[in-house]
């Protein structure tokens, strides 16, 4: 993880990798997701680790979904859980504080005009991500035999 000179802020395009992985089943080849952060995961560091696999990546925002240990660990670097107005609230809050260099949210407002409001372009993939996680990695992998729990470490 490394700190960035400029905040990654707004909606970024991602592409799927390892499409047969259940976590991204149903994803389009290219999809949008929100980011709001001052640091990043270094792609090359992830690729050097044989325990980690990048499932979705972005040229601009870096690795987005990383999976490890056959799905027992899942890392998401953006904010698919964000409501349509979350980035708007962050942007307006920082402007109201008079902060220097407040970044304009990338691909967030209709025609890049805040007065036209934001466009939520990530809802379907966010829902699919959480549905797949619950179905394939929580529900189907959860043992209901207390004696088996000790073997999951």
Role assignments for model-derived ranges:
Residues 80-153:
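Acyltransferase
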